[in-house]
Curated annotation (Swiss-Prot):
Influence of temperature on activity: Optimum temperature is 37 degrees Celsius. The activity is abolished at 70 degrees Celsius.
Membership in a protein family: Belongs to the nucleoside triphosphate pyrophosphohydrolase family.
Protein name: Nucleoside triphosphate pyrophosphohydrolase
Effect of residue 219 to E: Pyrophosphohydrolase activity is reduced 20-fold. It affects the magnesium binding and the protein structure
Record organism: Mycobacterium tuberculosis (strain ATCC 25618 / H37Rv)
Underlying gene: mazG
Enzyme Commission number(s) of this protein: 3.6.1.8
Length: 325
């Protein structure tokens, strides 16, 4: 006698070694889908008649399965679950919620923004707490947001994409940015970081050091990111204004909005300087739309010569902006 156990999530997929045995007389347990009797003409219910040579089931705890295995029946089972299979279940569950849930079906990318922000902060709290249980739960909540947004994108009338497209984009990015590690090469930390940054720069093809800086993030994180980009681009330190490097907090001042305004103004200055440097490099006889040469490395002298405003500091006070914005 033989017991064939299939994966309950994919009950119509059977192990290849079981195929020859399913051509004859087969019984199946009641949880199996109707596709079983349709596909196997000789199949009948496990409760009908005498025991057939083969029992097909997706339930390892079914009484008929337990009885036959206890009597010495041979077991042919589906391969063990692979890591990540529960993600497939989560995708299917999200699809069901999106199509059948009254609340889920009405949500948009914009309506979910506050939940995404809340879950991100809750995950950060979980990391800080050191609680493994809390961390696992909050990672799941953040994963829900990823699945939800991907499922909403699938319904878009223009440029729809699926969760598989999201995963494919991620895999392509990782494959491009960490080729050495993924190829099994022995690589130093410095070389890995260099590969990553080089690939990232090639992908983004930024025209400005401020490109791809997401201004919707908290003002302090925004300031840190912009300062980091500016320093990497060789901007002299004294051109970074005090109002974004030193934050003052008081009860009667909106510190978040004040800092954000200062950072956005600094971004404007960066872009103005970059445009002026580009004009100076290409000359007045070349139209801007014909100039596709990336700025590349900007020297300290270029930053200083084309910076659109002076910086408040204790040494020289402040000067007015040149009028560029």
């Amino acid at each position: 006698m033989i017991v064939v156990l299939v994966d309950p999530r994919r009950p119509t997929l059977v192990p290849v070694e079981a195929i020859e045995f399913l051509r004859g007389e087969v019984q199946y347990t009641e949880e199996m889908p109707v596709a079983v009797p349709w596909s196997l003409p000789a199949a009948r219910s496990a409760h009908a008649g005498n025991d057939a040579p083969v029992l097909l089931s997706s339930d390892p705890n079914h009484p008929a399965v337990i009885t036959r295995l206890a009597a010495g029946a041979r077991l042919i089972s589906a391969p063990d679950s692979q890591r990540g299979e529960r993600l497939v279940d989560a995708v299917a569950m999200m699809d069901k919620l999106r199509t059948a849930g009254p609340w889920e079906s009405e949500q948009t990318h914009d309506s979910l923004r506050r939940y995404l922000l809340e879950e991100t902060y809750e995950l950060l709290d979980a990391v800080r707490s050191g609680s493994v249980d809390q961390l696992r739960e909050e990672l799941g909540d953040l994963l829900l947001q990823v699945l939800f947004h991907a499922r909403i994108a699938e319904d878009a009338s223009q440029s729809p994409f699926t969760i598989d497209d999201v995963a494919d984009t991620l895999m392509r990015k990782l494959g491009n940015r960490a080729p050495g590690v993924l190829a099994g090469e022995s690589i130093s930390l410095e070389d890995q970081l260099a590969q990553w940054e080089a690939a990232k720069a090639s992908e983004k093809a930024r025209k400005s050091v401020a490109d791809d800086v997401h201004t919707g993030q908290p003002a302090l994180a925004l300031a840190q990111k912009v300062i980091q980009r500016a320093q990497k681009a060789g901007l002299p330190a004294h051109l970074i204004p005090d109002e974004i490097t030193s934050v003052s907090v008081s009860a009667d001042v909106d510190a978040e909005n004040t800092l954000r305004t200062a950072v956005l103004d600094f971004i404007d200055r960066l872009r103005c300087a970059e445009r002026a440097i580009a004009v100076a490099r290409r000359g007045s006889n070349v139209a801007e739309q014909l100039d596709v040469t990336p700025l590349g490395v900007i020297t300290e002298q270029e930053w200083l010569a084309h910076w659109p405003t002076a910086v408040n500091d204790s040494r020289g006070g402040s000067k007015k902006r040149k009028g560029m914005r």
